[in-house]
């Protein structure tokens, strides 16, 4: 059985498929009511599964008529998406942000499950056992070297 976050994620992705558009607008209260969950559950899904690293932009308006507008970033080809990711990676990157990038690569079928697990193992904090600042810098450098390889092979 999937957890509530998985169910909400699949629902939002289905909205994209059904609309044939690159933009979906949802209302927090409606989604929370539909899935009998608190609005913060929806916020969690948006913040972790529809990130820039996954290829989405989020616009949010709070209040009575508030909405969340989720836009697919228009990168129809692998090169455009890889270049987008390379621009997102600064001089350092946290393990969580790096995992979001790996999830995005998996979602776009640029890597398979096995490759994703190998990349995660290489950039994991246990593998890079050093101070956090150095670890995040090395993780960013690894990803910056790895992404072009994924693009060309």
UniProtKB/Swiss-Prot annotation:
UniProt KW keywords: DNA-binding, Repressor, Stress response, Transcription, Transcription regulation
Induction of its expression: Up-regulated by heavy metals such as Cu(2+) and Cd(2+), but Zn(2+) and Co(2+) have no effect. Forms part of an operon with mcsA, mcsB and clpC.
UniProt GO MF annotations: DNA binding
Listed InterPro entries: CtsR, CtsR_C, CtsR_C_sf, CtsR_N, CtsR_N_sf
Signal peptide: none
Known role: Negative regulator of clpC, clpB and clpP transcription by binding directly and specifically to their promoter region.
Family classification: Belongs to the CtsR family.
Assembly and interaction partners: Interacts with McsA and McsB.
Name of the protein: Transcriptional regulator CtsR
Source organism: Staphylococcus aureus (strain NCTC 8325 / PS 47)
GN (gene name): ctsR
């Amino acid at each position: 059985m999937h957890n509530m976050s998985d169910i909400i994620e699949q629902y939002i992705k289905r909205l994209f498929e059904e609309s044939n558009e690159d933009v979906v607008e949802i209302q927090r209260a409606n989604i929370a009511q539909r899935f009998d969950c608190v609005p913060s559950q929806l916020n969690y899904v948006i913040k972790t599964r529809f990130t820039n690293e996954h290829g989405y932009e989020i616009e949010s308006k709070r209040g009575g008529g508030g909405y969340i507008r989720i836009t697919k970033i228009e990168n129809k080809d692998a090169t455009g998406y890889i270049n987008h990711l390379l621009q997102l990676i600064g001089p350092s990157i946290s393990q969580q942000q790096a995992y979001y990038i790996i999830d995005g690569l998996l979602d776009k079928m640029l890597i398979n499950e096995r490759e994703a697990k190998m990349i995660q193992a290489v950039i994991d904090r246990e593998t890079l056992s050093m101070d956090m600042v150095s670890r995040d810098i090395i993780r960013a450098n690894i990803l910056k070297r790895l992404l072009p390889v994924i693009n060309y092979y």
